[in-house]
């Protein structure tokens, strides 16, 4: 009888499908301005979302900051904030393969989180969050120049008022290139990054 029950139990275990990995994983960024909760899209952008999650799980984002507020010309309530390890080699993981929006199907919408990069395949621990849609950041196959766009990998699900406050932070007028006038005077600390229930 017991042997029969054990065999039935074993057969059920073998027949049961493996639990699927969640398609969305939530991450909480506790900042000096408040909490931002992000849903990472593990299904559509597994490499990029997995990379961000590695930074979270290894505590590499704890103690970093949001250091850039890039406000749109003519509409300072739109733009993006950028944060992360800011070229700190001790915190950086190896670069990842680029996942363009033309492959993932994701778009750069209000609240989208995406990876900052130089060339495709150089993204590591720098990311940005949009305030307002920015379709120009999506991949533009068939265009001229760098048409790969940026790798969107999730969406803010709570804390957009915090993101907007960071975007409105005072910036230095100095800087060079694209960063001119965008570096935050008093950087917004990322106190803790962790998985959220």
Kindly label every feature range from the protein language model.
Residues 1-6:
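Bacterial N-terminal signal peptides that target proteins for export
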Residues 7-15:
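Bacterial N-terminal signal peptides
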Residues 18-197:
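Cyclophilin-like peptidyl-prolyl cis-trans isomerases
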């Amino acid at each position: 009888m017991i042997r029969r029950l054990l065999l039935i139990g074993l057969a059920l275990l073998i027949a049961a499908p493996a639990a699927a990995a969640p398609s969305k994983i939530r991450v909480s960024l506790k900042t000096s301005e408040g909490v931002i909760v992000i849903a990472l899209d593990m299904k559509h952008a597994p490499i990029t979302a997995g990379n961000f999650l590695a930074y979270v799980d290894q505590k590499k984002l704890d103690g970093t900051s949001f250091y850039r507020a890039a406000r749109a010309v003519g509409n300072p309530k739109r733009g993006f904030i950028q944060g992360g390890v800011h070229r700190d080699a001790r915190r950086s993981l190896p670069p990842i393969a680029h996942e363009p929006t033309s492959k993932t199907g994701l778009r750069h919408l209000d609240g989208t989180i995406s990876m900052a990069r130089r060339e495709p395949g150089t993204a590591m621990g720098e990311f940005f969050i949009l305030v307002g849609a920015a379709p120009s950041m999506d991949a533009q196959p068939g265009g001229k120049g760098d048409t790969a766009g940026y790798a969107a990998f999730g969406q803010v699900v709570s804390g957009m008022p915090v993101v907007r406050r960071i975007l409105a932070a005072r910036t230095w007028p100095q800087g060079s290139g694209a960063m001119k006038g965008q570096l935050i005077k008093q950087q917004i600390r990322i106190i803790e990054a962790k998985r959220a229930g």
